Amino acid sequence: MTTIVRDGPLSGAMRRWAAIILTSLMLTVPVAPAASAQIGQPDIIQEHWYHSYLTLTLDVQAWASDYPEIVVLTVAGETELGRNLWVLKISDWAQNLKPDGTEKEVVYIDGGHHGNEHLGTELAFLTAEFYIEGWAAGDQEVIDVLSTTELHILIMLNADGNDIDTRWNINQVDLNRNYDHYWNTCPTTQPGSSAFSESETEANANYMNTMVSDADLYVTMHTGVWIMLYPWGKWPQQPSDWELFHFIRDDVHANISDIPIRNANQGLYPNCGTSRDYGYGVMGFPTFTFETDDEQFLLGSVEAISDRLGEELDVMRYLIQNVWYWRARLVVESIEIGDGLVDAHVVNLGRASTSNASLHYMDSSGELLWQSSMFGINATNETEVSLDARNLTLVEGGTWSINYQKRVIDASMWVNESVDENVIRNKGGGSGLLPAPSMLLVFVAFALAAINSRNRKFK
């Protein structure tokens, strides 16, 4: 495995030795005072001492108490030792919808699968801190994001392992090999007795399925090497949504960071049963493993943590700020009906492709009357399609929608979105097309009914 070391104020080796010295000194500080100082003296403690479960609990509870308008603290489940898996739900909760009345985007982040990978946990913490403190400071970027987006952040999944500084959970299981996606099919150690044998991974997957099933971004944070990994870990082949991942890679490299961004199998090694591949292969999310640093097993940092992870936080801000684009976004520009065909012009504003879009026509009660054949449209592209409409019958009050998956991966969520009635044009004359009755036909029908009624009266 290639280790990538960035240039900075301290080399990797020097930084590790300095951290060892710092950690030795800090271990002389009693645990309880350090915990209370975590909040009261952020410049001294927060910037150099990695979180324990206790100090994290103090911090997230303080945030929820101080900023109830944007922070909701909930529990996804418990560790094997019964510790709470805290999740911060961060958004402008004064409004449940975006300003335009549509549903908010959803982002899911977790850290701390491996208890000895503290900088991954700290990046999850810093991400939450950026949006909470930015809101308090009136940062316009943060205000805009929280008005349109929900952030769900589980900062420390392996709290038991974190506090004894070990990769495994208390049962000696590697939590990031314990998910139900090709579990135990790669060379690995300690994947557990079965998929989801551990309470931590079961709780994390349950949260994905019940609370953030419509997420358009999932980032899981680790350390070990400086790299971002997208699916797959099991296979070297590119994932179905390679266009999306390659766009993000190229955009990050052009504008933010030179961090390597690769398929996990090629960029690291074969790895199965991971939360990343579960998030993509089962949930259909765009997913990244964010390996923030090569450091492991240290409890503190000489360099300020916010400086050390500043570049990585910039990448997270980019991913979150642009989450609207991490799916297909189809807009029907026009529909023309006639001659047994429906001609449609469809634009994809998103950075992901979709391969199975179709037009739907419903009556006023929402009952499906007609469905087109499926068609695909690539990311940031547009298409003109002619669809067989010989069995289409128009009715008064009928409406149109477009139905499609948000990404190419089979697990991706389906959406059904309304088509603006102003873009629909009925040219008439097509076989099987029955427009609403004209006024002349209505008048004739009433006249015939009156004559028939009169004839019955005088019989």
Regions found by a protein language model. Give the residues of each.
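Secretory targeting signatures
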Residues: 1-38, 344, 427-459
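Short glycine- and acidic-rich boundary segments immediately preceding or forming the N-terminal edge
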Residues: 37-86
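C-terminal accessory segments enriched in acidic
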Residues: 39-49, 183-432
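Extracytoplasmic low-complexity repetitive segments enriched in small/polar residues
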Residues: 48-51, 79-82, 96, 109, ...
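Surface-exposed patches in mature extracellular/periplasmic domains of secreted proteins
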Residues: 71-77, 137-145, 217-218, 261-265
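Short beta-strand-to-loop junctions in surface cap/lid or active-site-entrance loops
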Residues: 87-100, 112
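Alpha-helical scaffolding within the catalytic cores
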Residues: 94, 137-141, 270-277
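Active-site/substrate-binding loop(s) of hydrolase catalytic cores
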Residues: 100-113, 118-242, 250, 289-291
